[in-house]
Amino acid sequence: MSLLTEEIPMRPDDQLAAGARNLLLNCAGLKARDRLLIVHEDPSLGWYDKAAPLALGTEAEAMGISTAFVEVGGPEDDESSLTADRASADCDCVVYMARIGDLNRFEVGADNKIRIMCYARDADALASAYGRTHHDAMLELKDAVNDVLLGADRIEVSCPLGTDFSCDITDQVREFGDVAVQRFPVGVPQAILAEGLNGRVALARYLTPTGNRSYKPASLAFDEIVFANVKMGRIKGYEGDTATVADVECHYKTVSDIFGIDPECVHSWHAGIHAGAAFNKPAADDPDRWSNNVFTNPRFLHIHTCGAYAPGEICWMVLDPTVSVEGKNLWQDGRLCLEEFAPLRQAAQKWPILSDLMANPSDEIGLSG
């Protein structure tokens, strides 16, 4: 078991405690005498700090929740998942402050435990608006966005770099509840299936993993914009600098060969809805870490590709999208619009914190300019 068990400190500061309670009470629904396991990643790997799991455990113990810790490695460490599974046998809830919580998150769980993947990677994130915005408010915002998108016949998407595609919505089934592992904070609506997606997507800066499975190289960096041409959810080719196109095609072949999957499939897409999401390090330091932190910010729409399943293996990150439904913008230049559609207006009226959040978004996204 983790040494953190012996290191639970004094109560965290008020904002950090509020973020912890938001997760424990509003997301997990825990109560006194419940049993909690916090699976936390080795801080030396650079994705999670030590202070956030400590703060969560401190607040849980103060609430009368029996708390245990286990430290794990990264997603490429096969033993980590086994270690976490063994440690969770007698608990009611598992909170993953570790990337292994994201692996195969779309699979259906069979043990009825509450499982939560925490994207607040450090104490600063947990204490910020990202961690403190009421979980129920974000759930209602997600539902409102789903109402608009899933009720549409066609959605139009563009971006300043030249992305221009439409997506026809054909009887997509509404998902109630989250994937097998709940996500905290709530950051994206239901993914829109790309079977009816036609147009082109500007690929810029990086191709990154979706977090579903671990592979190497995890990302591809490039300087020139490449356009992916898509027809009915299939990649039909790339346009742009010859060498860069070759690099993109090679990366797709590498990843698809590793898993024996369809490299041409564009499975689904969604855009961020949590304006508190921040990434204060340069994306170039670790493009994988960047994209898997910042994807919940409304300034990004991301597209799941390479694999005919959710969420695929390679992600396209589209900066500052405009997403239009019936001639009205749901996102405009990377800002989620609360006023254009009745479901969002109603959510904002019920939860004024949503208007405050959108009026004061985080623009720390790891990119300059």
Language-model segments: what does each one mean?
Residues R213-S214, G240, N280-A283, E313-W316, ...:
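Short conserved micro-motifs at the rims of enzyme active sites and ligand-binding pockets
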